Amino acid sequence: MTEPLLIPCPHCNGLNRIPAARVGEHPKCGRCKNEVLLSKPFDLKQIDYTNQIKGDLPLLLDVWAQWCGPCKSFAPVFEQAASELVGKCRLAKLDSEANQQLAGPLGIRSIPSLILFKNGREVARQSGAFPLPQLKAWLRSHGISA
């Protein structure tokens, strides 16, 4: 029998133990009763950061800014990826302007920047906007079935 996955709620930051076999069944948070695995990216804030990157499912973070043209053109690609990767990888967005206290320590040098976290650690980073097939290939190269 496989161990349940520990997945932080994107709404209240509460930790949830979800049986791996039930990941595709739209599990709800035990604390706030909202869906834990979203088919769209969620907004990451400083207060949530440490807890959110530690979940058992990988977290792909898109660091962006309102004024950034490539960020805006990449947003629909990231949204589509979120809908296709439910249960495989969680996708979050970090507005680098509104969250400078977090973007700074992450060492963001250009945007958009993607940072992939597994088990609380950064495992990969990629800058720039690219099409969905290239994003999925990049994720597969880091062990995520996309």
Regions found by a protein language model. Give the residues of each.
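Conserved redox-active cysteine motifs that mediate thiol-disulfide chemistry
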Residues: 63-77
